[in-house]
């Protein structure tokens, strides 16, 4: 190799090393100063919570289009780790759902180091409102349906159908309440009292979360938390949201909290499944019978109900 060729090769390697070091430095600065973003790519991440809020099942959460706790939390973590993201917009269009899944998402939202603004679209009720109490600010469309602060548990009663079909269920149990919630028989007064106690406990937690997140007196929240829904306008008057507006207004609010000037760029956050994860999700997807059995189990929900 000639001397000129060697010099050219060394120069090329030096340039490549310099580019890598500059990239690493930019990433480090973006991570350390999330409000500054990365270069010109200062963006507001959009994390969507659409449909019923549910607990993830196996690997199927990667294939789900609904608001499973693991998918939403994964999207939040992705936004937190992205150096081009300065703030997060939590887009909520959900009637709520699982008590546990709602609480998991709420904790993830509250724990975000980057500012989070929640935006209420058509409906952000019950669990949809619960998760938003972890955000720094809530922007609601004037005609959104929100509120529905409360807990519900529904048990399918199939005794009449089983009787018509001539099906009987024989149960051997260790205690009188072991089969509480069985669709083959109604609840006893004692079992109803037990279930009511669980509902009341989850309800008190809901009230505490709203009081803390919205900086409202607990007594005031209790007066609002009878399960009714509120429009965005009513919610603003009651202190349940911070402002009325569109999604664009919410993006501007998120950018403002991050110190961004002008209209921020947005970036959709959605965890993508690998080919292996898609295959595993298809294999482990619950069959219809198992899915029906899960619906028959007693459960507590922060959910808008008719």
What spans do the regions from the language model cover?
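Extracytoplasmic ligand-binding site segments that recognize negatively charged/polar headgroups
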Residues: 148
């Amino acid at each position: 190799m000639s001397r000129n060729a060697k010099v050219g090769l060394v120069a090329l390697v030096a340039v490549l090393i310099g580019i890598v070091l500059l990239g690493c430095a930019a990433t480090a600065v973006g991570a350390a100063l999330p409000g500054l973003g990365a270069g010109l790519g200062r963006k507001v991440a959009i994390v969507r919570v659409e449909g019923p809020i549910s607990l993830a099942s196996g690997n199927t959460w990667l294939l789900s289009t609904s608001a499973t706790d693991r998918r939403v939390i994964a999207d939040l973590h992705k936004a937190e780790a992205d150096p081009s993201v300065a703030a997060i917009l939590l887009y909520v269009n959900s009637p709520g759902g699982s008590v546990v899944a709602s609480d998991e998402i709420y904790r993830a939202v509250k724990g975000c180091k980057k500012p989070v603004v929640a935006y209420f679209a058509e409906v952000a009720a019950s669990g949809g409102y619960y998760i938003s109490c972890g955000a720094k600010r809530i922007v609601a469309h004037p005609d959104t349906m929100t509120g529905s602060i409360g807990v519900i548990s529904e048990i399918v009663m199939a005794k009449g159908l089983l009787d018509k079909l001539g099906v009987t269920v024989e149960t051997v149990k260790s205690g009188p309440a072991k089969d509480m919630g069985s669709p083959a028989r109604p609840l006893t007064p004692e079992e109803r009292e037990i279930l009511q106690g669980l509902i009341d406990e989850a309800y008190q937690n809901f009230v505490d979360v709203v009081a803390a997140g919205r900086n409202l007196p607990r007594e005031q929240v209790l007066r609002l938390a009878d399960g009714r829904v509120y429009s965005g306008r009513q919610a603003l008057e009651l202190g349940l949201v911070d402002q009325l507006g569109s999604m664009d207004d919410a993006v501007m609010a998120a950018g403002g909290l991050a110190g961004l000037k002008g209209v921020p760029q947005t970036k959709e956050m959605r965890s993508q499944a690998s080919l292996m994860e898609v295959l595993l999700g298809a294999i482990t997807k619950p069959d219809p019978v198992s899915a029906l059995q899960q619906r028959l189990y007693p459960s507590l929900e922060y959910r808008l109900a008719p």
